[in-house]
Regions:
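A solvent-exposed interaction/effector surface
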Residues: 1-194
């Protein structure tokens, strides 16, 4: 009897992992071209993209949690007429003065004219210009300690390469909060001076 219970639980777990994997594979990932790669660090060229964004106050963790809801309601047409917009990855977050701006990149094929207007006055649509960025990729839980460690590694690498970061870092989250830390894809990115 115990053997059947264990086999049943193992089968259910495998099913959940496969379901999660299929869901992750169906999410459009933001496009970029790798210019230079060194282990977990890359210099990338990003094309112009359209984002839906919101600015929230509080800690990094509080801001991304409170900012996610209004952006999700926008793309899933919960507070507006029209079609749903597919979720993409990553969700990004950047410190701006004493607040945080959280962004959802719109799927390729959308431009500012084609996107429905947000009904929430705090949600903004904006086109970002092409940009060159340095990025470090890592897995793990979204903790400030881990982010500080990886941020320091990226800053040190840029200094050795003679690259000048512009502004504050962007935190990029590729997975939902239910994904185990060891399976997560996280990144820290800096825009680079020309």
């Amino acid at each position: 009897m115990l053997l059947y219970l264990v086999l049943g639980l193992a089968t259910a777990l495998i099913g959940l992992v496969l379901f999660w994997y299929v869901q992750v594979q169906n999410v459009e990932i933001g496009r970029y071209t790798v210019i230079e790669a060194d282990g977990d660090i890359e210099v990338r060229q990003y094309p112009a993209v359209v984002v839906a964004e919101i600015t929230q106050t509080g800690s990094r963790d509080q801001a991304v949690r409170s900012g996610f809801g209004p952006l999700a309601r926008y793309i899933f047409a919960k507070e507006r007429e029209g079609e749903k917009i597919a979720m993409t990855a990553p969700v990004t977050q950047k410190a701006v003065a004493s607040a945080w701006t959280i962004q959802f990149v719109m799927p390729s094929g959308y431009d500012l004219e084609r996107l429905p207007k947000p009904t929430d006055p705090h949600v903004r649509l904006r086109q970002l210009p092409p940009t060159r960025r340095a990025a470090i990729r890592f897995s793990g839980w979204w903790t400030d300690d881990l982010f500080r460690l990886k941020d320091a590694a990226l800053i040190g690498w840029m200094a050795k390469k003679g690259l000048t970061p512009v502004g504050t870092p962007t935190f990029a989250y590729y997975n939902d909060p239910f994904t185990p830390g060891f399976l997560r894809r996280n990144e820290i990115l800096y825009d680079l001076a020309p």
